Amino acid sequence: MGHRKLSSPRRGSAGLRPRKRADEILPTPKNWPLVNLKEPKLLGFIGYKAGMTHVYMIDDKPTSPNYGKEVYTPVTIVESPPILGLALRAYHIDSKGELSVLVDYWANFEEGSLKYLKRKITSLKVDSSKMKEKLDLIQKNLNNITYMRLLVSTQPWLVPSLGKKRPEIVEIQIGGGSIQDQLNYGLSLLGKQIPVRDVFREGQLTDIIGVTKGKGFQGVIKRYSVVEFPRWHKHRKGSRKIGARGPSISTPSYVPQPGQLGFHRRTEYNKRIIKIGDNVNEINPAGGIVNYGLVKNTYLVIEGSVLGSRKRPLFLRYPIRPSWSPESAPKITYVNLASQQG
């Protein structure tokens, strides 16, 4: 059966290894895009997947065969309440030539929304007496600083559908402008509510990083799409398994084997934001979204499907390799608000 190696050399993609459970429910980007912005801006945001519906919109992509026509488009609703700026983190290249943290400058946790947040995260301990020294250290090393990033916190208590109060704390890079501009911009966000409109605009592309739906421990038929053997009397060794795996100690890594399926960290590139809205009556279906409820905060409408289950946090990042650059949002002519409960 020598032809088998040519017609079907392997199963599965090596680019998706290891096929294991994600380390955290909200992954953070491993790389950030180099953006050409005149003014500094955050390069990411966090949202919660609510569900899907469909819209009719005017296709505005010039290279599309349906350009200028009304098209049916499935969309995903992502609820995105404001995030809180917690700390400004400066990165530099250390003596080993590696990227490392120079200093963290934290906001005052005795004021405003951060006072409530401090009760939610009891492990968060900040010595405010040393903050002036840390800010002076940043000012002295501006020429050596490579990146400025902002530590932010989500506010899940603003989303009743989640049923959770413990926030996620993530790090978002500041892009655009000079390092001094990024420092001033980051300081202006500390302790403040940051809406999604300050980061993204309608019509632009975004990369979405998250964790896929978990399927548990699965066999090779479902995990690698191995062809099932015919069920007849001479196939006595089973049908839903591979024909020959060999000794376990010398089994090649590309041979399909059962194991974890789903709950993997994945990145979906160039998803388009076709709408950012505050009027929830324009997006909530009758009776609410199944297994989620009603959207009650600022929301994003993403073209197409998005990875993950309902209520799962998603990290939205500026596109690292955009396929095209939309100038504006497409015109939406109809949004389906019919009940999803039959």
From Swiss-Prot:
Protein's name according to its UniProt entry: Large ribosomal subunit protein uL3
Pfam families: Ribosomal_L3
Molecular function per GO: rRNA binding; structural constituent of ribosome
Family annotation (InterPro entries): L3_arc_euk, Ribosomal_L3_dom_3_arc_sf, Ribosomal_uL3, Ribosomal_uL3_arc, Ribosomal_uL3_CS, Transl_B-barrel_sf
Keywords: Ribonucleoprotein, Ribosomal protein, RNA-binding, rRNA-binding
Any Gene Ontology biological process: translation
Family: Belongs to the universal ribosomal protein uL3 family.
The keyword Ribosomal protein is assigned to this record: yes
Subunit and interaction comment: Part of the 50S ribosomal subunit. Forms a cluster with proteins L14 and L24e.
Gene Ontology CC: one annotated term: cytosolic large ribosomal subunit
Gene3D superfamilies attached to this UniProt entry: 3.30.1430.10, Ribosomal protein L3, domain 3 (4.10.960.10), Translation factors (2.40.30.10)
